[in-house]
């Protein structure tokens, strides 16, 4: 298996049609309530059941700018599928995520990709800061309503976290590029290498005639634990590790910025980013141990990611938490001292709080990837005058996704602090509906 090859191969048409038959087409479909972008789930599934796959894809695109992406990376088991009526009958939920991916992939491979209808141009310019899922979703909905949409991206590639954060074995870049290409065909303009707040200010954008601005700049600032030894060589954030491997070909020693390829790698964390990091390290030939302070039951990662990580031979060391790192005389990390943890009473997240037992163990390692969450990059919010900020430099918004400055809306991780692709897309959709209402009234 190659390093970039996608692990989940998707459904065949026969399997998809058989699975679609299981959908009971409920009169009150609770699955739709579980979807942050309100996809008409029974409608697209019944189209698949009839063999009308292109119509199914059309239904998906009415509400989702990125169906092939969501079919791959959404935590369906916590959203739409968790509301499926079959669960009440002690049966497995309809595989909504697999079916969404099937319809989107089928349409792409058929060569008959339909574009959603676009309203006549209204001549109003809007700017989007960041080209991740929130920005792309917002851009798609605004261009459909006839707005002149410009997306400004700080990196050299469009796609935000879909490109730099999620490895290709889970979400191939070419899939993301097709979705971006569709937005281009609909009329969205993209500009890379533009840091709003540095390259160009919000005031300058407004002087260029932009009437509304949506900030979807994400959470690119990695969290660390603040323990001794985190500054040793080869201790890095998952953010840096994945960005370099995914976007900058850093696994290739011939590149300008090669990464240290560890033989014994420790990944700290229990979310999807931790799974992506350990599965990436495994593909680079490492012996990988995942260290997580709670038990496996409390891991926030998608069940499918945990299953794949285990199948690929990742060692799980739960109820352990790094206390400090050790290094050789050159300052390169060579080990980690771990606190052995036990679960206490539930905390505010509803999960049982991990507490130290007083016991420690030591592991050898030559690389550590820290995946304990991210915070919004303060650069964009701090560069906007009169903007109310929350904890950790998040942008404070109302229900309509409007900030304390009425012409500026925001969504995704810059508001939430660190969430999922689909929640960011839901924010982008809500912001688009409300900003369009404001600008057209």
Model-found features: residue ranges?
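Feature captures the FAD/FMN-dependent oxidoreductase FAD-binding
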Residues: 55, 120, 125-129, 177-227, ...
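FAD-site-proximal beta/loop scaffold in flavoenzymes
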Residues: 231-262, 346-418
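N-terminal Rossmann-like FAD-binding beta1-loop-alpha1 element of flavoenzymes
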Residues: 124-150, 274-282
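Glycine-rich dinucleotide-binding loop and its adjacent helix/turn
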Residues: 103-120, 178-198, 222-284, 389-404
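Rossmann-like dinucleotide-binding cores of NAD(P)H-dependent redox enzymes
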Residues: 148-151, 155-191, 278-324
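Iron-sulfur cluster-binding cysteine motifs and their immediate structural context
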Residues: 25-50, 69-101, 154-157, 187-190
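Ferredoxin-type iron-sulfur electron-transfer modules in oxidoreductases and energy-metabolism complexes
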Residues: 2-20, 40-72, 90-118, 245-246, ...
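A conserved FAD-binding loop/helix module that cradles the flavin
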Residues: 277, 414-441
